[in-house]
């Protein structure tokens, strides 16, 4: 089907089938030849105005946002004069200037100076319009292969492959995290002792340009390697049976130039939550695109200050941060973000699904949050209100950090007094609660409290204690005891987050690495290829 400027429809996740050309599977037989995280320098933005907010609901309600696993960004600036790209997904236009296209369609890039949205012409229909740059890849490149997911982590690969719907032998190819220029083949497996698990095989490059997992079987391209192992296990845990499914990625923004948008372009459809400072709605932008909309009560924050902060927030882009799409900057302020289907982590933990979560899932969710916060740390930003109510959950237990930075702008007296009823004392580091010193290290303290929310399935921290009592006791050195059924190693991690001296608390980089490796510290990084 050719490209059109038709009325968009919501598209679902793409399903992937193994489609390998005949004759491409023959190898050629030439026979030529736990990471310790570094402690980053923590810097922070000026603490600015004190914040707070301690109602049962998050300041913006217990919300719901995007329900997709973000597919990795697989395209970049055009190199070597390449202007012909292939579509990785279907895309339906959202505005009159967008171009609809179908997966597999070939597109000529007219102008790629527009950042996230490129002007392109369909080679099948001849029509021209803007396309999301992360929905296409250079024709005939490795990035255009369905099974190639680029720069995703080992843990993210396992998260995708361990879906119960995947048959044994489901696979993907990604960049190696440990060896520059090498790749990794990740394959789902099953055995009676371990149940579902994932095996990782390093794909090495030959000086001559070929590829191999074991030196006795070599290939001229990754496509040949995948085709061969789809027919022969030849020492792998299983032959390759199906490409790992992923969902469409979020576009970077709603469309080209859609940032400050008119209020009447939004339709509020279903109220999802209500908090101290506003409401959260599921809605539609421009009649085409599902979004979440936060409506702030007039007087909650200065529109000018919000717009200035939002310009910074929209530049924060990470697969574990809820994406800020657009704003209505006149009061009542609207904040438009990606929509996630499972609501806030707090509601999720306390709800029906919470009872089925076991330690591996809880640790994985914590690792995802730490990953998003490690990015915030690298960007020298501060969240200021990190807790389960401000984490959002999508399909497949995907977690994303929301509401970063907004707390600094709130002007409500009960929020800014730091002792008021709306201030989240129980999550706040003592130096922030007492003196307004909000840094990435006070976020680390809050993360330790969030870990107790995870391990207790949403219990309020410091049970039986009121805010004033918590502040007094913490100042005297009190720390929460180990929650029931929580491993001592996790409780020790919480204690590290609650050290009195902020500089002695771990970095989010360290927390991410610790949690991602929590169950894999004794496993080899890769299966031994030359023993196949």
UniProtKB/Swiss-Prot annotation:
Residues 1-56 are annotated as: Disordered. The active site is at 385 (proton acceptor). It is an enzyme of class 2 (transferase). GO terms for biological process: cell adhesion; cell differentiation; epidermal growth factor receptor signaling pathway; negative regulation of extrinsic apoptotic signaling pathway; negative regulation of intrinsic apoptotic signaling pathway; progesterone receptor signaling pathway. The keyword ATP-binding applies. Residues 80-141 form the SH3 domain. It is found in: Cell membrane. Residues 26-40 have a biased composition (Polar residues). One of its GO terms (molecular function) is non-membrane spanning protein tyrosine kinase activity. Residues 7-19 have a biased composition (Basic and acidic residues). PROSITE patterns: PROTEIN_KINASE_ATP, PROTEIN_KINASE_DOM, PROTEIN_KINASE_TYR, SH2, SH3. Gene3D superfamilies: Phosphorylase Kinase, domain 1, SH2 domain, SH3 Domains, Transferase(Phosphotransferase) domain 1. The modification Phosphotyrosine is found at residue 415. A lipid is attached at residue 2 (N-myristoyl glycine). Its EC number is 2.7.10.2. Residues 266-519 form the Protein kinase domain. It catalyses: L-tyrosyl-[protein] + ATP = O-phospho-L-tyrosyl-[protein] + ADP + H(+). ATP binds at residues 272-280, 294. SUPFAM superfamilies: Protein kinase-like (PK-like) (SSF56112), SH2 domain (SSF55550), SH3-domain (SSF50044). Residues 147-244 form the SH2 domain. InterPro entries: Kinase-like_dom_sf, Non-receptor_tyrosine_kinases, Prot_kinase_dom, Protein_kinase_ATP_BS, Ser-Thr/Tyr_kinase_cat_dom, SH2, SH2_dom_sf, SH3-like_dom_sf. Keywords: ATP-binding, Cell membrane, Kinase, Lipoprotein, Membrane, Myristate, Nucleotide-binding, Phosphoprotein, SH2 domain, SH3 domain, Transferase, Tyrosine-protein kinase. The keyword Ligase does not apply. PANTHER family: TYROSINE-PROTEIN KINASE. Belongs to the protein kinase superfamily. Tyr protein kinase family. SRC subfamily. This is Tyrosine-protein kinase Src-2. The gene is src-b.
């Amino acid at each position: 089907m050719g490209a059109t400027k038709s009325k968009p429809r919501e598209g679902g996740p793409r399903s992937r089938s193994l489609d390998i050309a005949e004759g491409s599977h023959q190898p050629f037989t030439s026979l030529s030849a736990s990471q310790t995280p570094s402690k980053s320098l923590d810097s922070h933005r000026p603490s600015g105005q004190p914040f707070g907010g301690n109602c049962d609901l998050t300041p913006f309600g217990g919300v719901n946002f995007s329900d997709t696993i973000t597919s990795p960004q697989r395209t970049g600036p055009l190199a070597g004069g390449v202007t012909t790209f292939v579509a990785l997904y279907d895309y339906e236009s959202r505005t009159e200037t967008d171009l609809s296209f179908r997966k597999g369609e070939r597109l000529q890039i007219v102008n790629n100076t527009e950042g996230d949205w490129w002007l392109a012409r369909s080679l099948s229909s001849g029509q021209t319009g803007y396309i999301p740059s992360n929905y296409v890849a250079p024709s005939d490149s490795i990035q255009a292969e369905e099974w190639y997911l680029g720069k995703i982590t080992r843990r993210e690969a396992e998260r995708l492959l361990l879906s119960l719907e995947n048959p044994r032998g489901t696979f993907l190819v990604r960049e190696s995290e440990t060896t520059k220029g090498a790749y990794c083949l990740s394959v789902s497996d099953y055995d009676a002792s371990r149940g579902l698990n994932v095996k990782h095989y390093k794909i090495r490059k030959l000086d001559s340009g070929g590829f191999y997992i074991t030196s006795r079987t070599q290939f001229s391209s990754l496509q040949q390697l995948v085709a061969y192992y789809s027919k022969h296990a030849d020492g792998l845990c299983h032959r390759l049976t199906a490409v790992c499914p992923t969902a469409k990625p979020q576009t970077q923004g709603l469309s080209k130039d859609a940032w400050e948008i008119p209020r009447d372009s939004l339709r509020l459809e279903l109220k999802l939550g209500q908090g101290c400072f506003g409401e959260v709605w599921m809605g539609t932008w421009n009649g085409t695109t599902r979004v979440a909309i936060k409506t702030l009560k007039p007087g909650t924050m200065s529109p000018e200050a919000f717009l200035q902060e939002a310009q910074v927030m929209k530049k924060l882009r990470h697969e574990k941060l809820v994406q800020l799409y657009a704003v209505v900057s006149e009061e009542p302020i609207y904040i438009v973000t990606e929509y996630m289907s499972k609501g806030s982590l707090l509601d999720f933990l306390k709800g029906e699904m919470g009872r089925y979560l076991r330690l591996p899932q809880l640790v994985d969710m914590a690792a995802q949050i730490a990953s998003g916060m490690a990015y915030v740390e690298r960007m020298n930003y501060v969240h200021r209100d990190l807790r389960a109510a401000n984490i959002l959950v999508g399909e497949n237990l995907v977690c994303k950090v929301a509401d970063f930075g907004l707390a600094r702008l709130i002007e409500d007296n009960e929020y800014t007094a730091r002792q008021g009823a709306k201030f989240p004392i129980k999550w706040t580091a003592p130096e922030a609660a007492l003196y307004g010193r909000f840094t990435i290290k006070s976020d680390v303290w809050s993360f330790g409290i969030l870990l107790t929310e995870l391990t207790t399935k949403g219990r309020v921290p410091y049970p039986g204690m009121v805010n004033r009592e918590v502040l007094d006791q913490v100042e005297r050195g009190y720390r929460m005891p180990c929650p029931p059924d929580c491993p001592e190693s996790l409780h020790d991690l919480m204690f590290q987050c609650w050290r009195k001296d902020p500089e002695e608390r771990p970095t989010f980089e360290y927390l991410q690495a610790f949690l991602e490796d929590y169950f894999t510290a004794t496993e080899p990084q890769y299966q031994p290829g030359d023993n196949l």
